[in-house]
Amino acid sequence: MVKNQIFSLKSLWSSSIFKILYCYLFTSLLLILSTWVSVNDGLSVREHIILLRLYFDTNGTTWYHNQGWKEYADCILAADGSVRKALESIDPLTGQIPQYLWADHFSQLDNNKTLYKIIHNQIQGHKVVICNAFGITCEDRINLTGIDLSNNNLKGNITPYLPYLLHLRNLNLSNNHLSGCFPDGLLKAQSLVALDLSYNNISCTLSLADSKAISYIDISHNHLTGYFKNVWKTPNLLFLDLSFNKLYGTILKEFFRQKSLDYVNLSSNQLIGFLPILSKSRISYLNISNNRLIGNITLLTCWKAGSLRIFDAENNMFEGALPESIFDHSPLQYVNLKGNIVKDPLPSILDCAKSEVKIIVPDGLKQNKCDPKVSSNWVLILNPLGEEFNIVGSDFGINSKSINIQFQNGLHCVDNVTTIIKSNTIISCKNPQGRNSTYLKLTIPTGEPGNFTVIKQQLYYYRPIIKSCSKVYKNIGGEITILGSHLESFNKTSNGKKMITVSIGNIKNSFTNVTSSINSDGFSGEVISCRNADIITPDMITCSIPSNTNLQQPAEIQIIIDGITAYVPIDSTRPHFLYKGVYNKDITISKPTEYNQTITISVPNETIIDMDQVVRVLIDDNDDSICKNIQHINKTSIQCLPYSETCGSNVKVTLVTKYGEPQFTTSLNYPPPIITRVTQGIDSTSNSIITINGKFLKTGGKRNLSIKINDTICCPLYNEYYYKQDELDDDNNNNNNNNNNSTTDINNNNNIIKNNNLIKEEQILCYYQINQSLPIHLNLPVTLTLSNQTVVKNNIYSQTNSTCPNNCVKHRTNGCRSGICECYPNLTGPSCDENIPESTISNFSNYLPDFILSFPKFITNNTFNIKFLSISEVNESGNIVDRFCSLNNNNNNNNNNNNKNNNNNNNDSNNEKEVVEDEEEDLDYSSQNDNNNINNNNNENNNENKLNWKLINQTKTTNALYTLKIKKKNVTLDILISSDNNQHREVYFAGEVIQVPKSSIELIVNLKGKWLFKDPKNQLKFNFLVKPVNDHDYSLCLPSPFVLISDEPFRWITMDVDSSTIFAKPSNRFLLNNYLVRVIEPNYKLSDSNLTLNLYYQFNQTTLKQQDNHGDDNSDNSIKYTEDSLKFRIDFSTFNSRREINPKPRGCFKDNTHKFPYDYYIVFFGCASGLILVLVICIVQCSRIESRQRKQIIKSFKATQKMPVEIKTPLLPPSFHFNFLDYNNMDLNNNNNNNNNNNNNNNNNNNNNNNNNNNNNNNNNFNDGSDTFNNNNKKNLNYEDNCDTVGFDGKENDIKNINNKKDEKEDDGDDDDDEDDDEYEDDTQPCSSGNSSRSKGSDGGSSSNSLSSDKQSFNNGNENNSIIPENKKKHLTIINKK
C-alpha cells in the first residue's frame, strides 16, 4: 500500500513537472512570437526616413493629394530630436554623408533599435499608418513595395535615396515637376520591377541598368544627357521608353539582344550610326524617329525581325529603296519613313497591302500598281488524295483571308483556308480529294477597295504509278500485291465497287500514254484479268492470279483506275510480273576473281534448262538487279555481267525463261574480304572513325556487314573506292612524273584513271565509340563479317620494335603495319613538328610554275595542284586591260596560237583544259586589246606576248626556279618554289617573322623591271589556282571545297576537301625595290563547279610606290610605273583533318573540326599577359578608389579646434574611436547634452583641466598647478568667460556633443542608473539653452573624440594616475563637483 502511494506520488510529481515544462515552453514561444511581431510590425527606419525625405524634398504641402502624409510627417518629427537629426543627416543640400557611405548609413539606421522604438511608439500612439497614405503600397504593413505619386504636383529635386528602398517594386513619379539628377543606382535596384519618371525635368546622365527584376522603364520627356549606354543587363526588360531626351551616341547590337525586350522608344534624341541587327530580336514596337541614324533602307534588318509590328524611323538619314520582301518575315502594321531619302518607284506590294498596313513615305514618289498575276512557266500538279500545293505569282498581297480559291467542281480549299507562304508571291492551300477538276479560279484584291482580279489557272493530277509486283507459283496461283503511288479511285460502279481493272500479259505496244482501257487485242499470247482487284491503300493493290496459267515471261502489268491508265516506267526499273522460281541444284556458276567480272552460267544438258530460252537473269531475286549483256554461248551455257553492286557469297541467281517456272541457284561466290591495313587509329580521349582498307569489301547496299574491334562493335558507315599507288622507288616515280606526263590521264567526269602503277582498293568506315571504363590497347584484332564471310585481322596495331609504339603513344595515334610505324596525327593546323605529317611535292612542269602537294600514303591519297595562272592589269571597274597567262606551250612555238584556237594541244591537253575550265574568263597569251589582230600578227610578234617559262636551277626534286621575260612590258617574272623544310621554323621576310610549318612549300614571286601602267589608277593582279586532284570515286558525292579565311593575326586561307586541308598563308608585307610595304589581303573565288579555288593578290597605287618615266621627255606624264623590283611570298602546306560524324544527304560526311592553325605557346602567353594586365589595372584602380575615399573622409570631417600637446600616460587604456554612424552609442534622450563637464571658471586658477583638455588619443591631461602649460600651449586653448563660446565656431554640420556622452548604454534598464542620472543633472551647471561645446584640435586635422562615457578621471591629491572603475565614475564626478 505504501509502495503504491509512493508510486502514485512519483507519477503525480513527474506529470506535474511535464505540465510545468510544457507551460514554460508555450509561454516562451508566445513571448518570442509577440516580440517578433512587435519588432517587425511596421516599416524599417530607412523607409521612414526616406519617405520623410521624399515628402520634404518635393514640397509635400503643395501636393494635390497628400492625405495621410502631413499627419505622418508631423507625428514622427514630434517624437524626438534624434529623428530630425537622422533626417537632416541625409539632407541633399547639406551633404553631410558622402554618397559612397549611403549604404552603410542606412544599414546603421536599420540596426538602431532605439530609434526604431521611438518611431514605432510614436506612430502607434497617434494611430498613424503610412501604408494608408495616398500613393503608398505596403506588403502586410511591413515592407514598402509601391509609390505612385503621378500627376500630383511634386516640385523640387528628386530624392536620391530611392534606390535604397530594399523592397520597392513599383515607382511612379510621372507627370510632375521634379528636377535634379537621375538617382544613381536606381536602375540597379534588385527589387524594382516598374519605373516611370516620365514628363519631369530630370537631368544629368542615365545610370547603368543592371537588374534582373526590372521589366518596365519609362523616363521619357526629361532632360537626360550623356552617352547612350548600350550595356543593359536587364534580361527581363519588356518596355523601354527614353524618348524626348538629349542622349547621344550609337546603338550597339548587344542592346537588342535582350530576349524579353518588346517595346523600345528612342525617338527625339541625338543618336547616330547604323541600326543594329534585329533579325534575332523579339521587338514588336520600335520608334527611332527624330535622330541621325544612317543606313541603306533596302538592307535594314528590321524587315527580317519576326515580331516587329510598328516601325517609326521618321526624320533620320536613311537612304535607299524599299525592298520587295518587306513583309516576308515581319508582321508589319505601321511603317513611317517620312523625312528620309526613299528612292522610287515604290514596290507594288505597298499598293497591294495598303488596306492592311499603314505606310508613310515622303510625298511625290512613284508607286507601282498592284497587278496580281500567276507565273507563266508554273505548272500546277495536284495530288488526287489532297495535299498542300503552292501557287507562284506576283502581287498576291499579304492578307490570305482576302484571297479566294475555287475549283471547277465548285469546291474550295479544305477548311476554306488559304495561306501566304511568301508575301506577295506564293500562296498555298490544300485541294479536295478527286480528279474531277481541270482548272481553278483565284480571286485576289488589287489594293483598291472593292476591286478584285480573277485568274483562271489550268491544273493536272498525278497519274497512278506502278512500282513493283509480287510473285506466285505458276501451277498454284494466288494473290499478288502491286505497289505504287496515287492508286486511289474516287468513282464507283453501279454495284458500289471502285472502278479498277488489272490485266497481265504480253502487250504488243507500249501503253504508257494510254488514257482508256484496252481489250485483249492489245496483247499477244495469253492474257489474264486479275480477279477481285481491290485498293488496300493509296500505295497498294491486291488481286488474284488463277492457277495453271501460262503467261509469257516477263509479263506486262496494266492498271486502269477511274478510266486513267497507270504509268509504268520505261527504263530498266520497269516492273513486270514473274512467276516464283524453284531451286535447281544442277545450275553451276563460275567463280569471279574480281568485281564487275563476267560470269558463266551452265547446266549439264538442255533438257534441264534450254539456255536459248533464257530472257532474264536476276541477282538476289530482285527485278532491279539483273545480269546485263546476256550472251547465249550454246543451249547449255550463257554469259552475263552482274550489276555493279553484286558482292558476297552464296548470291542467289535466278534464270527466267519465256515459258515455264524460273529456276535459281545460290552458287555465285565472290572472294572473301581481305583487310590490308587499318588507318585513322583509335583516339584515347574521344570517339573515332576507323578506316579499314582492303579488297572485296563491297557491301552492295545491303545491311549484311558487321565490324568488331576486339569485342566492341564498330558501327559501319559507308564504303568507297580509291586508287592506291604501288610502292615504287621514289626516284623512279619522280622520273616518271617529270619525263612521261602523258602516262596519266585523269577524266574527272567519268572518274577513270589510266595508269599501270595504280590499282583499285576499297575502304569501309566505321564509328568506334570508346568505353571510358576500359583501357585503350594498341594491339586489337579487327573482325569483319560481310555476307556470311568473316575475316579476322589479328594484331592490326602490332609493332615490330620499341620505337614505333613509343612514337605512336607520344603522338596519341595508333597504327603500325608491315613493320612500318604509322603515327598519323589528327591535325587541326600547324602546331609543332611531331604533329605534322610529311607532305611531298612533285610533278614540276617544264612549261608553267606548278606543283602537287600530297599526303603520306598511310593517311590519304588526296592531292592538291597549285598553279600560277596569270598576271593582269585591271582598271577601277575590275575589267582586265592587259593579261598574260600561263598556258602550256608546244615545243613548236610557231604552232602555239593555232593549237590554242583549235584546242588540239596534244602534249598537255589535260592541263590546258583545267586552266580553261577554272578561269572565269577566256585565257590568252597576249593582251586582250590585241585579240582582234592576233591572227594578223606574225610569229615574232606572237612570241613577244607569250609567257615562255624556263625551268632553271632544279638541283633537287623539291626545288624549282621558273623565270620568264614579258617583252611587251619589259619586265622579268621569277617564281621560286621550294619545299626543303625539315622542321617547323621561323623565317625573316620583308621585315616580318613568318611561321613556316614543317614540310610546307615556299613560293616567292619576284617581278623585276618597271611595269608600264596604261592608267595610273589601274592595279596589278596575280592569279593562282588551287585544285584538288583526288583519286577517289566520288560518284556518291563530289568533293566540294570549303574555303575560310582566318582572323588576325594568323591570316590563313584554308581549303577543305573531303578529309584533307590545304593551308595558304601570304606574308603581311612585300618588298618594293627593297622598301617594306603593307600587303593587301588576298581574296578568293570558287569556280562555278565548286571544285577549284582562285587566289588573287592585287596591288594598287596606294601600296605600289610609283614614279614617272625618267629619261623620256616625250613620255606621257600620266603613265606610271612600278619600281624596279616587286617581291612577295606565299606558303602552302597540307594537313589531314580529323573526321567526325556529321551526316549529309546521300551518305556523304562533312568534317567540322577544321580550325585555323595556331601556336599554343602564343595563345597561352597572350592569355597570361592579359590576365596580369587586368590584375594590375584592378590593383591600381582599387588603390585610387581607396585613396579617393580616404581624402573624402578627411575632407568631410575637418576638425574645428587644434589639439593641445599630448601628455603621454602609459597607464591609460587605448583610445576609443568615435563612429559617427553608430546611433546606438548616442544619448538620444538628451538634446541639450548636459554640459556638466564644461564648467570652467576663470576665477578659479586651481581648477582641474582634465575634463576639457582632450587630445586625439582620448587621454585626460591633468594640470596640478597653474603653470603647467607654456605660453604656446595657452595660445592654443580658447578659454572664454561664457561657456557658450568655448571652442564653438557656429557650424551646424560639425559633430555635436562629442565630449558629453553618457556612461550608461541606451538599453540598460537599471533604475539606480536612472536615479544617478537625475542627481547628476540637478548638480551640473549647464550652458545656455541647448548650445553644446566643441573642442578644436591643436593641429586642425581631426575632431577630438573624448566621450564622457569613456573619460578617465584622476585623483587630485595623488601624483600617480589611477583609473576609476566604470561603475563609479559618475558618483565620483558628482562628489567632486559638490
From Swiss-Prot:
Residues 1354-1364 have a biased composition (Polar residues). One of its GO terms (cellular component) is cytoplasm. The chain crosses the membrane at residues 17-37, 1160-1180. Signal peptide: none annotated. InterPro entries: Leu-rich_rpt (IPR001611), LRR_dom_sf (IPR032675), Plant_receptor-like_S/T_kinase (IPR051809). Glycans are attached at residues 59, 112, 143, 172, 201, 265, 287, 296, 416, 436, 451, 491, 513, 596, 605, 634, 704, 710, 740-741, 771, 788, 801, 826, 843, 861, 875, 907, 953, 970, 1090, 1100, 1331, 1360. Residues 886-946 form a coiled coil. Residues 915-924, 1305-1324 have a biased composition (Acidic residues). It is a multi-pass membrane protein. Residues 891-945, 1227-1378 are annotated as: Disordered. Residues 1289-1304 have a biased composition (Basic and acidic residues). Keywords: Coiled coil, Glycoprotein, Leucine-rich repeat, Membrane, Repeat, Transmembrane, Transmembrane helix. Residues 891-909, 929-945, 1227-1276, 1328-1353 have a biased composition (Low complexity). LRR repeats lie at residues 143-165, 167-188, 191-212, 213-235, 236-257, 260-281, 282-304, 307-329, 331-353. Residues 1368-1378 have a biased composition (Basic residues). Its main location: membrane. It is found in: Membrane. PANTHER family: OS04G0122200 PROTEIN (PTHR27008), OS11G0695000 PROTEIN (PTHR27008:SF497). This is S-cell enriched with leucine-rich repeat-containing protein slrA. It comes from Dictyostelium discoideum (Social amoeba). The gene is slrA.
